[in-house]
């Protein structure tokens, strides 16, 4: 039996049929830029309906925001204006007559990385349209009471919040070019693009420094679309971090980019199976 897993972001939707730690099939769709909740819900229903099979035992969804993980109710969603606080899991359960779970996308990314890499104490940080983190303590996902344990993008920084400087928003706002375009230019050796990523790395160091003071993880794994630019910002990040963090805390810390393109989908399947095993379904 497989789990149909969804990773819903601000610009794209990833789906996969997942069996254990194996992705059987994957699909990608652009998320409609305009529209209301009804239109977005219809979009999700259409995508899910296209890929449900008799072997599918349930649906697991990651979203960028806070979730009541017991009921699957969305409490606050970031970067998807058409998705309000709503009982998304129950609505989909009623539609497809199957079990549905919902969790924060960064939580599922971290859970997937922990399962694939056997990490016991780590942060999985997603760098995409926004910023989020999943926290793994002693091999278990820690979400906090309101699924907000990793909402580090909302930390105060400069003239706003740190997400504005540590996500794809930084490049469009401060360099007036997309992160994808700057990545291509950096690959060509363009000095302006390389400098933009160096500055990005310095901002990211400030965010990581704050998370180290709170969580003190052994490993930090970066995911999300911006993480593909890891080689262009890691040195600036490390250099800045040395001036911000107590030396021994950095001695055995590893910071790396994810080697698993769909870790969040693996994490979504694992989350569903954990809920199923603990008899959370009615």
Language model segments and positions:
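Short beta-strand segments
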Residues: 7, 60-64, 103, 124-130
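Glycine/small-residue-rich loop that forms an oxyanion/phosphate-binding "nest" at active or ligand-binding sites
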Residues: 76-81, 100-113, 125
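A cytosolic small-molecule/anion-sensing beta-strand core signal
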Residues: 19, 63, 70, 137-138
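A short acidic/small-residue loop/turn micro-motif
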Residues: 31-33, 82, 149-151
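Short hydrophobic alpha-helix segments
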Residues: 27-29, 78, 145
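Glycine-rich phosphate-binding loop of actin/hexokinase-like ATP-binding domains
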Residues: 120-169
């Amino acid at each position: 039996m497989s789990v149909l897993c969804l990773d819903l972001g601000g610009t794209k939707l990833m789906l996969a049929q997942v069996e254990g730690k194996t992705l059987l099939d994957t699909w990608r769709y652009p998320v409609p830029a305009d529209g209301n909740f009804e239109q977005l819900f219809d979009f999700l229903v259409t995508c899910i309906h296209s890929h449900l099979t008799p072997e599918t035992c349930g649906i697991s969804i990651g979203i960028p925001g806070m979730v009541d993980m017991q009921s699957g109710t969305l409490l606050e969603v970031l970067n998807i204006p058409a998705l309000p606080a709503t009982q998304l899991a129950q609505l989909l359960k009623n539609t497809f007559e199957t079990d549905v779970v919902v969790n924060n996308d960064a939580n599922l990314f971290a859970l997937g990385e922990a399962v694939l890499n056997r990490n016991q104490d780590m942060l999985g940080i997603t760098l995409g349209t926004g910023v989020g983190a999943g926290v793994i303590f002693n091999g278990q996902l820690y979400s906090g009471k309101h699924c907000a344990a990793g909402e580090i993008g909302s930390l105060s920084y400069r003239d706003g919040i740190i997400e504005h400087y540590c996500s794809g928003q930084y490049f469009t706002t401060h360099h007036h070019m997309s992160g994808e375009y700057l990545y291509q230019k950096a690959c060509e050796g363009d000095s302006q693009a390389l400098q933009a990523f160096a500055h990005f790395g310095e901002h990211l160091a400030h965010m990581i420094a704050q998370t180290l003071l709170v969580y003190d993880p052994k490993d930090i794994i970066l995911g999300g679309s911006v993480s593909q630019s890891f080689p262009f910002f890691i040195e600036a990040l490390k250099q800045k971090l040395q001036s911000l963090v107590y030396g021994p805390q950095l001695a055995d810390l590893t910071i790396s980019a994810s080697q698993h393109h769909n870790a969040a989908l693996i994490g979504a399947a694992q989350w569903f199976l954990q809920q199923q095993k603990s008899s959370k379904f009615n």
